A protein has these predicted regions:
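Conserved glycine-rich Rossmann-like NAD(P)H-binding loop of the short-chain dehydrogenase/reductase
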Residues: 23-40
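Conserved NAD(P)H cofactor-binding loop of Rossmann-fold oxidoreductase domains
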Residues: 85-91
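Substrate-binding pocket helix/loop in short-chain dehydrogenase/reductase
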Residues: 93-106
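Active-site helix of classical SDR
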Residues: 117, 153
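Residue(s) in the substrate-gating loop at a strand-loop-helix junction
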Residues: 137
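C-terminal helical subdomain
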Residues: 177-178, 193-228
């Protein structure tokens, strides 16, 4: 079995790659930093005795050329899943951000993820026990001044996964979407953690593996964010507008 992990060289993606390799799955791991990706691939191959193909690809620009991924699949076991722990933010991401930064955020967090799905969807729909797993953010629950484009992209991605799950009903393909709170990665570095401490990525990676074929649709990690998802949208504007950080 082979899984494609987009964003697999650091943070959550790296933890997921480690977990899936430890369970004897072949991998294609993709990131923008080939040196780091090669190092991760080499370590996993030596440690777990599986095939791991490292590929370099920038998600910030479109169109995307996926021929190299297709060619890598020809030399591996059958494709079983597409896992997309992609996340990119910018400390200057506020309304009015420059066009270049805006499109980099939009393409990385939404457009490129959808293009990956569109490309491999016909294959995954035909094979048994396959999965597509996406990752959103609690930043998308209610937009604020900071992370404006990032949050909008993640909200759009959540909607896309809802449509995708509806589209593949009665097929062998499982579609899952994780709404992620603060976890211990570079995306949470520097964030205000007074109330919420970062959760561990290794634990989440284990949850992703163990539940990869469950048809739950959308879930939250940590679980308490489900309550916040319900409550935050109904906070009065007179109160919410004061949450600037």
């Amino acid at each position: 079995m082979t899984y494609i992990i987009v964003g697999g060289s650091a943070g959550l993606g790296r933890a997921i790659a480690k977990k899936f390799a430890s369970e004897k799955n072949d991998l294609i791991i993709i990131s923008s930093d080939l040196r780091d990706t090669k190092a991760v691939a080499s370590d996993l191959e030596i440690r777990y005795g599986v095939n791991v193909v490292p590929l370099q690809m920038s998600l910030s620009k479109t169109p995307m050329m996926l021929k190299e991924v297709d060619e890598a699949l020809e030399n591996l076991s059958s494709l079983t899943g597409l896992i997309l722990p992609v996340g990119f933010n910018d400390p200057n991401d506020i309304p009015g951000i420059d066009d270049k930064s805006f499109f980099e955020l939009l393409n990385t967090n939404f457009t490129s993820v959808c293009l990956f799905i569109n490309h491999f969807l016909p294959i995954l729909k035909k094979l048994p026990d396959t999965t597509i797993i996406g990752f959103g953010s609690i930043a998308a629950i209610r937009g604020r001044s900071l992370n404006a484009t990032y949050a909008a992209s993640k909200r759009a991605l959540e909607s896309y996964f809802e449509s995708l799950r509806h589209f593949v009903v009665n097929s062998p393909l499982t579609v899952q979407f994780y709404m992620i709170g603060y976890i211990d990665t570079n995306l949470s570095f520097g964030a205000n953690m007074t109330l919420f401490k970062p959760a561990q990525v290794d634990r989440l990676a284990g949850i992703v593996f163990n539940n990869r074929l469950r048809d739950f649709g959308t879930t939250f990690y940590p679980k308490y964010w489900k309550i916040i998802k319900i409550l935050l949208p109904i906070v009065p504007w007179s109160v919410f507008k004061k949450f600037k950080k």
